[in-house]
Swiss-Prot record:
One of its GO terms (cellular component) is cytosol. Signal peptide: none annotated. The lineage of its organism: Eukaryota, Metazoa, Chordata, Craniata, Vertebrata. One of its GO terms (molecular function) is GTPase activator activity. Residues 75-191 form the RGS domain. Keywords: Cell membrane, Cytoplasm, GTPase activation, Membrane. It is a peripheral membrane protein. This is Regulator of G-protein signaling 1. Gene3D superfamilies: 1.10.196.10, Regulator of G-protein Signalling 4, domain 2. Regulates G protein-coupled receptor signaling cascades, including signaling downstream of the N-formylpeptide chemoattractant receptors and leukotriene receptors. Inhibits B cell chemotaxis. Inhibits signal transduction by increasing the GTPase activity of G protein alpha subunits, thereby driving them into their inactive GDP-bound form. PROSITE patterns: RGS. The keyword Phosphoprotein does not apply.
């Protein structure tokens, strides 16, 4: 009888531990994915100057996790969902003198979350003057038709006024800037730092 009791207890213990084992396996898989990705990118990293460093604050870097960084490599959309991702991507775009793209995209996100009609009109004018109008300080690269459509909508701006322009800039970043970001020194050094020395193992 004592043998049966202890056998049953051990069985229960195994069942109780399974959720922990599943979570541990998921974390292990994430780590393997990140390790493999970084290994494939290390040749790019090692050809860069070792003396260079990013300007991100240490507090921002320390709170990131390998899981989150892996998400950034899946799509631009997943990168932009993360505030830290936005910050690092903006830093990269700034190094390429194209930070106006993400600034415009973020301004549009804020604009679409605005409920008050008067505030909407005010924000629409600010976005137009800063990013859309000819010779704007941070003029974005959109076609004439889209620019003209936004200009007409300013008379009675709606939530969708900048949708086409925002989509155009997102596609531009997705096809042009994002692939380079994933191979950039800014991203690779950050990712390697958060995964530790196991990347090279």
């Amino acid at each position: 009888m004592p043998g049966i009791f202890f056998s049953h207890a051990n069985a229960l213990k195994e069942v109780d531990n399974k959720p922990d084992e599943v979570m541990a396996q998921k974390k292990k898989n994430f780590a393997v994915d990140l390790k493999n990705y970084l290994k494939s990118m290390l040749p790019h990293l090692e050809t860069m100057k070792s003396s260079s460093s990013t300007s991100s604050s240490d507090s921002e870097k320390n709170k990131l996790t390998p899981d989150e960084i892996i998400q950034w490599t899946m799509s631009l959309e997943k990168l932009l969902i993360s505030e830290d991702g936005q910050s690092v991507f903006r830093e990269f775009l700034k190094s390429e003198f194209s930070e106006e793209n993400i600034e415009f995209w973020l301004a549009c996100e804020d604009y679409k979350a605005t409920n008050d009609s008067e505030e909407l009109r005010c924000k629409a004018n600010v976005i137009y003057q800063e990013f859309i109008q000819p010779n704007a300080n941070k003029q974005i690269n959109i076609d004439f038709s889209t620019r003209n459509s936004v200009t007409k909508d300013l008379l009675e701006p709606t939530i969708t006024t900048f949708n086409d322009a925002q989509k155009m800039i997102f596609i531009l970043m997705e096809r042009d800037s994002y692939p380079r970001f994933l191979k950039s020194e800014i991203f690779l050094r950050l990712a390697e730092r958060h995964h530790g020395n196991n990347v090279r193992g």
